[in-house]
Regions:
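C-terminal regulatory/oligomerization modules of transcriptional regulators
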Residues: 1-4, 125-145
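N-terminal leader segment of winged-helix/HTH proteins
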Residues: 1-33, 80, 97
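Alpha-helical structural signal
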Residues: 8, 12, 19, 39-40, ...
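A structural preference for long, well-packed, hydrophobic secondary-structure segments
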Residues: 5, 25, 42, 69-74, ...
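N-terminal helix-turn-helix DNA-binding core of bacterial DNA-binding proteins
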Residues: 20, 24-67
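Amphipathic alpha-helical linker/stalk segments
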Residues: 26-29, 60, 119, 139-145
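Charged, amphipathic alpha-helical coiled-coil/dimerization segments
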Residues: 23, 73-136
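Short, locally clustered residues in the helix-turn-helix/winged-helix DNA-binding domain
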Residues: 16, 44-48, 109, 136
């Protein structure tokens, strides 16, 4: 084992607190639409308009395919997504945001921008850029498939 002065538990705890704070804000914003933070990642992943397969969504969001199936079924029921399946029993199809889903995505983007400012307010501009850079560097170097 290498000589390491970094307390991994402190990093995990700090990131967990940030995540909890961000998810709480997200849930508050989505509540009037019958949605929670659980649905947010899917809406944002689909917000570029290209559509994605269920498998691609699961891989993009690093979630279990069964969770993707449940969330997309709910979003479909609520009218936020649709798919391009042309026949019953399609095994592979693309999921897209409906106009209603696109409206939510636009509101989420505005809300996320405001909440990001609030969460990162204690940091200087240089610290913000460094923080985001380091998070992505750690996430990408340690990504497991």
């Amino acid at each position: 084992m290498s000589n390491c002065n970094v307390d991994l538990q402190s990093i995990i705890t700090g990131l967990s607190k940030l995540k909890k704070k961000a998810l709480k804000k997200q849930t508050e914003m989505l509540k009037p639409f019958g949605l929670t933070s659980r649905h947010a990642g899917y809406i944002m992943a689909l917000s570029d308009g290209r559509g994605m397969t269920m498998k691609a969504l699961s891989e993009t969001l690093c979630v279990d395919p069964a969770n993707t199936t449940r969330v997309i079924a709910y979003l479909d029921e609520m009218g936020y997504v649709a798919n391009d399946c042309q026949k019953d029993g399609c095994r592979k199809f693309n999921v897209f945001l409906t106009d209603k889903g696109k409206e939510i995505a636009a509101q989420m983007k505005k809300s996320v921008a405001c909440d990001s400012v609030e969460i990162m307010d204690p940091l200087t501009e240089d610290e913000k850029r460094t923080f985001v850079y380091l998070l992505f560097k750690m996430a990408m170097d340690n990504y497991e498939e």
